């Protein structure tokens, strides 16, 4: 489909890629007309890897504040994100990870114009009020505490902290408690103004829609937003070569232990990554896997999981072995 204002990039596996010429926004269209529903998702190429000491957890806290109102969609007008989407019966959420933050809505295809307008507005018109930061900080801190009470999550966090001494994968997405509690609304605004721009984002639309109409709506609402006024900061820090094994011990209340082994592995875009994923399945996916037969079938473990973390930069290939009683 040729639409004025867009550059067609390529099609692969049923996915059509376009670039909005006005500002560099990447658009992925995946038509699927079996039901009158769509999924609209905006992914920002910013995650906890973009944080530094003092702002760890800022990406996640900002994700929470993205639901607290923008200039044209807020509770004072009776059309905040949650109010508007709830009235349409939409399912919606957001997630923050090491490499990215995404916001998505599953809703009827007749609501496409509404959701495009709403997401475009909060890309650059977020209110970001201190009165919203304080209660959301408490919510995020509670998430942090739940993670601290999870043996597996605590173990993963400590392994990443030991595996990465230079690269920002060193700290978890949730951040450190003191940063969560003390990061200012001004610092969050600075983070928002640095990374939340169309040339640092991808819009993905899946479902029942006409491509020309969808691109027209995206151009109408996103095309008025400029590119980032300054270059988006890039992470150039590379983790130095590890010179020996590293070990961590995490102690938590409980009866059973967990052994985890993490090997350095390549980034998700590396040509060897698919082979590592297949290796993980052979070793630990299901009751017929080799580690399951050697450990779980012999009552040495209660299960096993192995596989690589799919990340933008060189990652870790994990093997988790929850120990059986005795």
Where are each of the predicted segments found?
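An aromatic/glycine/proline-enriched structural segment found at the starts
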Residues: 1-4, 165-166, 173, 202-267
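Histidine-acidic residue clusters that define the catalytic metal-binding segment
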Residues: 1-18, 117, 143, 161-201, ...
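Mature N-terminal segment immediately following signal peptide/propeptide cleavage
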Residues: 3-43
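M16 family metallopeptidases and their MPP-like homologs
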Residues: 30, 35-51, 57-61, 76-122, ...
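Active-site SXXK
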Residues: 56-70
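Acidic/histidine-enriched alpha-helical segments
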Residues: 127-145, 210, 229-245, 296, ...
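Non-catalytic, conformational "gating/processing" segments within enzyme and secreted inhibitor domains
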Residues: 137, 152, 185-221
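Short acidic/His-enriched helical or mixed secondary-structure segments at domain edges of catalytic enzymes
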Residues: 139-158, 237-256, 293-303
């Amino acid at each position: 489909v040729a639409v004025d204002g867009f550059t067609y990039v390529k099609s692969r596996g049923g996915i059509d890629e376009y670039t909005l010429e006005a500002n560099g926004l990447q658009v992925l269209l995946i038509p699927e007309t079996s039901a009158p529903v769509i999924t609209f998702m905006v992914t920002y190429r910013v995650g906890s890897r973009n944080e530094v000491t003092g702002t760890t957890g800022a990406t996640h806290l900002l994700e929470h504040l993205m639901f607290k109102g923008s200039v044209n969609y807020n509770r004072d007008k009776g059309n905040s994100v949650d109010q508007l989407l709830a009235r349409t019966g939409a399912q919606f959420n957001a997630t923050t990870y090491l490499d990215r933050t995404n916001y998505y809505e599953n809703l009827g295809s007749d609501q496409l114009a509404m959701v495009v307008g709403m997401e475009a507005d909060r890309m650059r018109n977020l209110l970001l009020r201190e009165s919203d930061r304080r209660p959301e900080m408490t919510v995020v801190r509670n998430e942090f505490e739940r993670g601290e009470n999870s043996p597996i999550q605590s173990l993963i966090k400590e392994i990443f902290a030991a595996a990465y001494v230079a690269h920002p994968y060193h700290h978890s997405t949730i951040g450190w408690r003191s940063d969560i509690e003390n990061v200012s609304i001004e610092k969050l605004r600075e983070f928002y103004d640095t990374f939340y721009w169309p040339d640092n984002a991808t819009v993905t639309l899946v479902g029942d829609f006409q491509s020309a109409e969808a691109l027209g709506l995206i151009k109408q609402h996103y095309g008025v937003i400029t590119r980032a006024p300054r270059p988006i900061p890039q992470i150039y820090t590379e983790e130095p070569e590890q010179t020996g094994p590293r070990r961590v011990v995490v102690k938590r209340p409980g009866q059973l232990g967990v052994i985890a082994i993490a090997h350095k592995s390549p980034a998700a875009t590396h040509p060897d990554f698919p082979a590592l994923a297949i290796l993980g399945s052979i070793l630990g996916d299901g009751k017929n896997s080799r580690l399951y037969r050697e450990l779980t079938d012999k009552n040495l473990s209660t299960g096993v999981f192995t596989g690589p973390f799919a990340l933008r930069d060189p990652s870790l290939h994990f093997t988790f072995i929850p120990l059986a009683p005795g």
